[in-house]
């Protein structure tokens, strides 16, 4: 079982339709975006089951040169039986940062490290999903706030 370390900005989600939730409790959201996704899964009639951080994926961290474990944000199954592993990330973490403006060297190194780490995790997640017949998707603020 995954050990959980609580951070000050974490928030617990309590489902309105607990019969749809197939994960462990408490449901911890590490961002308002994750909380919004929980609400969407919980209230969307096409979602028949969902969980938070319910899958454990081994991946190779190319920066630390070792294997690590990745817990994607969500799993969801829809009425059509399509299954997804879903990660919620800021758009800025989805591309290699470009040096512009007054960004410090330290900031650039951290952003590059985040991008590379995400690339490693997502590569493993795509293979994991392929093996299970699932689809892996990353949702960014552009997806979350489209049409709002």
Regions found by a protein language model. Name each.
Residues 1-148:
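Electrostatic, structured charged patches in enzyme active sites and in nucleic-acid/phosphate-binding
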């Amino acid at each position: 079982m995954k050990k959980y370390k609580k951070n000050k900005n974490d928030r617990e989600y309590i489902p309105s339709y607990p019969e749809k939730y197939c994960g462990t409790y408490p449901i911890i959201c590490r961002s308002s975006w994750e909380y919004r996704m929980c609400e969407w899964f919980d209230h969307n009639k096409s979602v028949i089951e969902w969980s938070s951080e319910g899958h454990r994926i081994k991946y190779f961290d190319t920066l630390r040169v070792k294997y690590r474990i990745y817990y994607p944000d969500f799993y969801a199954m829809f009425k059509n039986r399509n299954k997804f592993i879903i990660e919620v990330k800021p758009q800025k973490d989805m591309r290699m940062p470009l040096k512009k403006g007054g960004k410090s060297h330290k900031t650039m190194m951290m952003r590059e490290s985040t991008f590379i780490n995400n690339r490693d995790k997502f590569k493993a997640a795509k293979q994991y999903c392929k093996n299970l017949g699932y689809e892996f998707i990353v949702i960014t603020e552009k997806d979350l706030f489209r049409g709002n």
